A protein has these predicted regions:
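N-terminal beta1-alpha1 cap of cysteine-dependent amidohydrolase-like domains
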Residues: 1-87
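Short acidic, glycine-rich surface-loop motifs adjacent to enzyme active sites
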Residues: 85-99
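Short glycine-rich anion-binding loops that position phosphate/pyrophosphate groups of nucleotides
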Residues: 10, 38, 93-95, 123-124
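Class I SAM-dependent methyltransferase SAM-binding "motif I" and its flanking Rossmann-like core
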Residues: 97-141
Length: 141
């Protein structure tokens, strides 16, 4: 059985209730996968992956490895990385860019096979769905 968390941003770190739920759910802390929202922005992805890892460390989680799923990860390695993951974090950010990248690599189908805890934040939570509705903001082009 898969476990999903759908979240918004955490500007003040993880709240205690979320930490408690994570501690009851996460059993494997070897491998953490951070699925970026903009696969082509390596520097930004590094920054936000580190921020999330720091919040996990502050909550008492210490993963042995971090893999950032973006354009730097060879397609041939994605299945193995997902199979080894204890937690897969789907980042917030550009919802449409993330959706396009997920479609390109077939990520949503791959996630259906994982035993990892899946956490979608903002755009990542939206992109976990099979049917995605994203209303355009009036200021969008």
């Amino acid at each position: 059985m898969q476990t999903y968390f759908l979240t918004s941003d955490f500007p003040n770190g993880f709240p205690e209730a979320f930490i408690t739920a994570l501690k009851q759910t996460i059993v494997r802390q070897e491998h953490f996968v951070f699925a970026a929202s903009s696969f082509d922005k390596a520097e930004v992805n590094e920054k936000y992956a580190r921020k999330i890892m720091d919040m996990f460390a502050a909550a008492g989680f210490h993963f042995q490895t971090l893999t950032i799923l973006d354009d730097r990860l060879p397609l041939a390695q994605i299945d193995q990385v997902l199979e080894q993951a204890g937690v897969i974090w789907l980042a917030g950010g550009d919802t449409l860019a993330q959706h396009a990248s997920f479609e390109r690599i077939g990520l949503r189908e791959k996630l259906k096979k994982t035993t990892a805890v899946l956490i979608g934040m903002s755009a990542g939570a939206i992109n976990m769905g099979d049917q995605i509705v994203l209303a355009r903001h009036e200021l969008d082009n």
